[in-house]
């Protein structure tokens, strides 16, 4: 049987690895079309419209049957391509956009949104004018509306910190996110979504709930399939710095059932906007009493979870499932096999070139570790969440076992421990 030609757009390192190690690899013929897109979603030189045309030509030339997008911005491209090519499956551009754009997620998809507001960046505007618009009491969580991977998030406790954050955003956001505008203005209605003509910053009330988790799954021909729930953990000394997420969740069954119901309600709203044939994960805050609030929605799979799902689930490989969806087949609901796993972040608060912060020699020798920087890359912008240099996937028989492994690896890999998240 001839292998299925599959195009992976804007691939990251982990996509190459996951496609090479996919079950039954002889079934597929993977093609990769690289792009100058950072994990954060930032880019100074990415011509999105030219890349989209390159995708069209590639699909025709190689008779591509499935297009895989495992990142936030590429999910928009995959959605548009699925509208243009009859043999491709995917979501509508509008529904993919509503997952990406955090302001419109709250406005149109989140059933019970937290308090939120938005700033439209303008370099000619006095900084003090921004503060007058926000009626939310401090503290705030502030973030660009269209970045990924928890990038450029800042916790703001007072007016001075708010002004500092705005000043930083004015310096970096316009240059790094403007590449999105031509695509959004072409395929969306600017009267319906006026923020696509600006570089907006989301301001949210700070939610001090003790638990954070993620419900992951997909929509296939209009049917919702839940993959599972993972727990997110943050460093106690730096509560905005993401430490890891572990799978499966240890939350009580009653709360997990409530999360699954909330997930399905959100996906039904997305389906009304045309969301289909794609993975989607929803991140939630969870209180001691079981109250839940939406953090954000990601309209794509979690590629770093693939190895974890493959080891902790029966029939749980998300790449295989996404290909099945792309071929018009509904994937089976996976089941737990008794193992536990986690994705652990190797994060720094240091500012230096990456090779002075991370031991690349050790990192390259570790199985299931994704390096997120190049040795010569300069790390200069550090928000409240720190800067993730790498992630490592660990699986074992207990959470205690994998946490001990992760703590040991962090201490081996970080060259400047004084800037580590646990200090």
Please provide the spans of the model-predicted regions.
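Glycine-/Pro-rich loop/turn segments that contact NAD(P) or position catalytic residues
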Residues: 96-115, 129
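A short glycine-rich, hydrophobically flanked beta-strand micro-motif that places a catalytic Asp/Glu
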Residues: 273-288, 422
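Conserved anion/nucleotide-ligand pocket segment
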Residues: 139-159
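Conserved ATP-binding module of the ATP-grasp superfamily
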Residues: 139, 159-208, 266-272
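A glycine-rich beta-turn/hairpin centered on an aromatic-Pro dipeptide
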Residues: 324-369
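A short beta-strand motif that forms the metal-chelation/ATP-contact edge
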Residues: 78, 290-301
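ATP-binding N-terminal substructure of ATP-dependent carboxylate-amine bond-forming enzymes
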Residues: 1-98, 125-129, 328, 348, ...
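ATP-dependent carboxylate/phosphate-activation module, predominantly the ATP-grasp catalytic core
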Residues: 205-269, 274-275, 298-321, 326
């Amino acid at each position: 049987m001839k292998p299925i030609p599959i195009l992976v757009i804007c691939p990251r390192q982990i996509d190459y690895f996951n496609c090479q190690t996919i079950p039954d690899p002889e079934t597929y013929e993977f093609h990769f079309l690289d792009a100058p897109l950072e994990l954060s979603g930032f880019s100074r030189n990415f011509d999105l419209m030219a890349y989209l045309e390159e995708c069209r030509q590639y699909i025709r030339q190689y008779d591509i049957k499935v297009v895989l997008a495992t990142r936030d911005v590429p999910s928009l491209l995959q959605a548009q391509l699925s509208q243009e090519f009859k043999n491709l499956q995917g979501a509508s551009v509008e529904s993919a956009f509503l997952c990406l754009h955090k302001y419109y997620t709250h406005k149109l998809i989140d059933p019970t949104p937290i308090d939120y507001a938005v700033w439209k960046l303008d370099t000619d505007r006095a900084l003090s004018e921004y503060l007058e618009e926000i009626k939310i009491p401090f503290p705030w969580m502030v973030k660009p509306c269209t970045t990924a991977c928890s990038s450029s998030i800042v916790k703001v406790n007072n007016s001075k910190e708010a002004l500092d954050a705005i000043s930083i955003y004015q310096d970096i956001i316009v240059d790094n996110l403007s590449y999105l505008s031509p695509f959004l203005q072409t395929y969306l209605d600017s009267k319906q979504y006026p923020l696509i003509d600006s570089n907006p910053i989301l301001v949210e009330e700070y939610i001090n709930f003790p638990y954070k988790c993620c419900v992951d799954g997909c929509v296939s021909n209009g049917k919702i399939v839940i993959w599972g729930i993972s727990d997110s953990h943050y460093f106690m000394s730096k509560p905005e710095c993401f430490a890891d997420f572990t799978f499966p969740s240890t939350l009580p069954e009653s709360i997990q059932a409530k999360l699954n119901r909330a997930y399905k309600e959100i996906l039904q709203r997305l389906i009304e906007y045309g969301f289909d044939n794609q993975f989607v994960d929803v991140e939630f805050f969870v209180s001691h009493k079981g109250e839940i609030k939406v953090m954000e929605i990601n309209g794509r799979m979690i590629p770093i979870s693939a190895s974890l799902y493959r080891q902790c689930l029966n029939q749980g490989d998300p790449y295989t499932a996404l290909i099945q969806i792309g071929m018009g087949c509904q994937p089976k609901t996976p089941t737990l096999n008794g193992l536990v796993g986690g994705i652990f972040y190797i994060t720094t608060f240091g500012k230096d070139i990456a090779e002075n912060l991370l031991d690349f020699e050790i990192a390259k020798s570790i199985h299931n570790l994704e390096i997120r920087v190049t040795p010569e890359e300069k790390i200069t912008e550090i928000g409240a969440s720190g800067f993730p240099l790498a992630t490592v996937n660990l699986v074992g028989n207990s959470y205690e076992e994998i946490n001990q492994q992760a703590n040991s690896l962090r201490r081996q890999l970080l060259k400047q421990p004084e800037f580590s998240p646990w200090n």
